[in-house]
């Protein structure tokens, strides 16, 4: 496990430098989800594959940018699912973006996730590593230095509602409006990593990406995005559930790009989700 996290650290350093120096134009290909791939997406994916391929403990790599997992070492113990540059379209407007990693054993189901890591590329580069607890690090002088253990309060003040509003179901719209009526502040950049990171650092709130009329199974992918952040939020004392009120880490990935509605937050906000969703 340690060598995997060290490889992720090296990947993050290289990606941070790439963001500073690379053309932001689009490549000629699209990823498995149909999104046109930025050159940064492609480069970030190659960097991560290169660094993780140096390890002896990784058996399989699954990238959000590729249609199928690849086996790199038959004797390896772990499977790594990752989104190399989540929110990459925000780079050209100079907003924060991130990388997300899930370290699995045996398969890519939620209960097989052993650790999660994400990186925020913003005014400074930060990393959160979630194993037994969720710990925050900052990149300084080429090294990731420990900052703090992340711990959510029971109730927060931030609301990050994803999905196109015109396609929200009435009960979800009522949930969002209820939180705003309580004085919750809107914090939504369109980047999953910085939005979820802000809620963690500010010690509470709700990030939601529901099932909608146009995307009833949600948009966010279990293996690459949802399961890793569910792990982080649980280790930080919060909860992460789907629209049925089920724990996200109890879900299975029916295929590598499987999606799900998802809600991440502190205890109060998740109970509000259950209330408005009748769960």
Swiss-Prot record:
The GO annotation for biological process reads: fructose 1,6-bisphosphate metabolic process; fructose 6-phosphate metabolic process; fructose metabolic process; gluconeogenesis; sucrose biosynthetic process
Instruction: Write out the residues that bind substrate.
Output: 86-89, 188, 219
Q: Which UniProt keywords apply?
A: Carbohydrate metabolism, Cytoplasm, Hydrolase, Magnesium, Metal-binding
Q: Which cofactor(s) are needed, names only?
A: Mg(2+)
Location(s), subcellular = Cytoplasm
SUPFAM superfamilies in alphabetical order? Carbohydrate phosphatase
The main enzyme category here is hydrolase
Which coarse location class describes where this protein primarily resides? cytoplasm
Its pathway is: Carbohydrate biosynthesis; gluconeogenesis
Instruction: Name the coiled-coil region(s).
Output: none
| Catalytic reactions of this protein | beta-D-fructose 1,6-bisphosphate + H2O = beta-D-fructose 6-phosphate + phosphate
Q: How does it assemble?
A: Homotetramer.
Q: What is this protein called?
A: Fructose-1,6-bisphosphatase class 1
Q: Which gene encodes it?
A: fbp
